[in-house]
Curated annotation (Swiss-Prot):
Superkingdom of source: Eukaryota
Similarity-based family: Belongs to the DP1 family.
Start-end of Polar residues biased regions: 223-233
Region Disordered, annotated ranges: 146-296
Organism: Arabidopsis thaliana
Biased composition (Low complexity): 180-193
Protein name: HVA22-like protein i
Name of a matching Pfam family: TB2_DP1_HVA22
Length: 296
């Protein structure tokens, strides 16, 4: 058996190349013979039909043994000068079949042309509409990309990159009246005296009282340090003079009540009494000075 590759090469040479060269020689003669031209036209008609059908028939008949060799032999049979098989096959099989179905074939070809034209128009419209929509989408996309969009504020990580926040102004605390705090012994004694003596009510709005630091009961050893601490008592906070005459009697009464409470509660320790008396005297003196200055 000849290989399929070699068989295909021989079919191309002996079935197409050599007959084409013989047809060329016949056409280029000074006086071409009509019979020779007719013969080669019939040959090429049969070869064209074989080429069309072998594309489909090879898938079903190529498994037959010696199929490629038989096809090569048939091509040689058609043009070989001694056999001249083209004339026999054309006149016996091909021409009678075509003459019988020529009208049907022409009608089918006309319908096929009409349908092909309609299908071409329909597909052209679809392609045009699709291309138009796609072009519009592309133009819209390009226009959207060209217009600048407002960029959202980027969140910067880390505390170092954050802008320093403006310090909020703290609300100014309102001055509240501060109560005079004394030692435990003096407070207890003053509470007892308050139970016995009626309290005096002062009309008008309450005013802030002067702050007096508490003087705890100190040991005799630490008497020197307590005296130094008592001398550094802060001066009373003086607000704008608004009805000072009502505030001053209250301050004097409180100081006198504290002095009386200090005198009523005898303390066996001498240094403590002297410290309290000195504190009361200093406070009275300062109150009198402030009162005289405000009255001026």
């Amino acid at each position: 058996m000849i290989g399929s590759f070699l068989t295909r090469g021989l079919v191309m040479v002996l079935g197409y190349a050599y007959p084409a060269y013989e047809c060329y020689k016949t056409v280029e003669k000074n006086r071409p013979e009509i019979e020779q031209l007719r013969f080669w036209c019939q040959y090429w008609i049969l070869v064209a039909c074989l080429t069309v059908f072998e594309r489909v028939g090879d898938a079903f008949v190529s498994w037959v043994p010696m199929y490629s060799e038989a096809k090569l032999a048939f091509f040689i049979y058609l043009w070989y000068p001694k056999t001249r098989g083209t004339t026999y096959v054309y006149e016996s099989f091909f021409r009678p079949y075509l003459s019988q179905h020529e009208n049907d074939i022409d009608h089918s070809l006309l319908e096929l042309r009409t349908r092909a034209g309609d299908m071409a128009v329909i597909y052209w419209q679809r392609v045009a509409s699709y291309g138009q929509t796609r072009i519009l989408e592309i133009l819209q996309y390009v226009a959207a990309q060209s217009t600048p969009r407002p960029q959202p504020p980027q969140k910067r990580g880390g505390r170092a990159n954050q802008a320093p926040a403006k310090p909020k102004k703290a609300p100014v605390p309102q001055s509240e009246p501060e109560e005079v705090s004394l030692s435990s012994s003096s407070s207890s004694s003053s509470s007892e005296n308050e139970g016995n003596e009626p309290t005096r009510k002062v009309s008008g709005p309450s005013r802030p009282r002067p702050t007096v630091t508490s003087v705890p009961a100190a040991d005799p050893k630490n008497a020197g340090t307590t005296q130094i601490a008592q001398k550094s008592v802060a001066s009373p906070i003086v607000n704008p003079p608004q009805s000072t005459t009502q505030v001053e009697p209250m301050q004097i009464e409180e100081v006198e009540g504290e002095a009386e409470s200090g005198n009523e509660n005898p303390n066996p320790e001498g240094p403590k009494e002297t410290v309290m008396e000195e504190t009361i005297r200093m406070t009275r003196g300062r109150l009198r000075k402030t009162r005289s200055e405000e009255s001026r």
